[in-house]
Structure formats: structure tokens, C-alpha cells
Amino acid sequence: MVSDIAGLRVLVTAGASGIGLEMVRAFQAGGARVHYCDISDGEGPGTDLDGVTASRADVSDRGDVARLFAEVEKTLGGLDVLVNNAGIAGPTGRVEDIDPSDWDQTLNVNITGQFNCTRLAVPMLKRSSNASIVNLASLAGRLGFSMRTPYAASKWAVVGFTKSLAIELGEFGIRVNAILPGSVDGPRIQSVFANKAAALGKSYEEVEAAALAVTSLRKLIPPQHLAAMAVFLASAQGSSISGQALSIDGDAQMMV
């Protein structure tokens, strides 16, 4: 565990479950002070840990985000690390069958939500001597993803957003990187596989096997590995890394 994150003030979006909760736990274990938001009620998993607080916020709602950052300022007294983790899977289907409202919702959460949070975080991060933004993208932001066009489009946008921010904010010492997970073990990927199986008329086991077959390591990614990368990027050891799209995907060659 990286140990030089003690005292850092960290905001994790969508921190009540899955990857987000693992990030909350990892930062807290390293001695950081962590506030997380989630679309569910504020008092949730992780708030029993020392130095962890939470509130409700929908990152696609600018009013919610404004209230969130006011609370972060009040609770943490500033910000050193923003982890833009919030995201949704979006619809599964052929492009001609996708409801435009589902397209809009996917992009509103997955990329506009990151903009909403980053826009308010940057003035706070400029006051920090060790500032970092970690954006969650996806393997779908490096490869195409059949029948998941809204999701893939949103994650390609996250990578472009990340690289542009790194250039813009570098002069202020703010590092910006993206993590691109592959198939991460947990309820979300189970739902994705189930939806894909239904859309293709295949079994769940067939879809899962096909996904693993195109990765060299033939495995799902433990969410703790993503949390460890986020902590590293926020630490002194990661202080020379910016503008990168870092894949944690078991060496996936394609998405199926």
C-alpha cells in the first residue's frame, strides 16, 4: 500500500459500492480523508470508517454537484484528489434500436458528469500542492464495443477529456489521468453479460467465456486493483504521471 497519501483530501464520486467503494477504502487505509457521493442516500457503506463522510449527489445534476462541492469545502476544507468514478452501463442493443433518451442519459452521467465535477473541483485543486484528477474510463474507450455504442462513445470522450485537461492544468501542477478497466468482477459486469446474452440469444456462460477468451490473462479484474492504481496516481510516486490512459484489462485484445 502506498503510504504517502496520508492527509490528502479526496472526493470519490459513486463511492457507495463496487469500484468506488474499493477506492474509498483504499484511500482511507492510506490515511487520506475521504468524502464520497452517491445517487443513493449519503449514509452508506464506508461511512463507519474513520475519516470518511458521504452525501447524496447525482453527478449529471448541476444543482446536486454544486451542493456536493459546498459540502466538500465545508467537510474537508479543500481538495487534493478528485476521482471521477460515477458512470452507468447504458443500454445494450443495436444502434437503430437504442432509445435516444438512453443515449442522452449515458453521456450525461459518464462524461457530462465528469465535466460538472471537474469544473468545480479545479479552483479547489489549484490551491493544493499535490493535486490529482483520476477519471474512470473503460476498455471501451480504447476499443470499439458492439451493441454498446452510447457507453463506448462516452468512454472515448473521457479519454479525450483527460488528455486535454492534463495539458490545460499541467502548469498548475495538477495531474490528470484516466484508468481504463476491462471486465471488472462484480454485479455490474454480471448485469452487462446478462443483457448481452439476452440481446444475442446466447447463454450467460457463452457471453462470459467469449469476453475472457480475448484477454491474455483469461480473468475478470478485481476492483481492488483499480483502487490501488488510483491511490498510486494520487501519491508522490505518481507525481510525474499525467495525461495517461492506463489500461487494467488483463491484456484484452478486443471487446465482444
Q: Model segments located where?
A:
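Short C-terminal tail/terminal secondary-structure segment
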Residues: 4, 89-92, 143, 219, ...
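Substrate-binding pocket helix/loop in short-chain dehydrogenase/reductase
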Residues: 93-95, 99-107, 211
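Active-site helix of classical SDR
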Residues: 118, 154, 162
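Residue(s) in the substrate-gating loop at a strand-loop-helix junction
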Residues: 138
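Short, small/polar-rich loop/turn modules that mediate ligand/substrate recognition or access, typified
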Residues: 170, 175, 241-243
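C-terminal helical subdomain
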Residues: 178, 186, 202-237, 241, ...
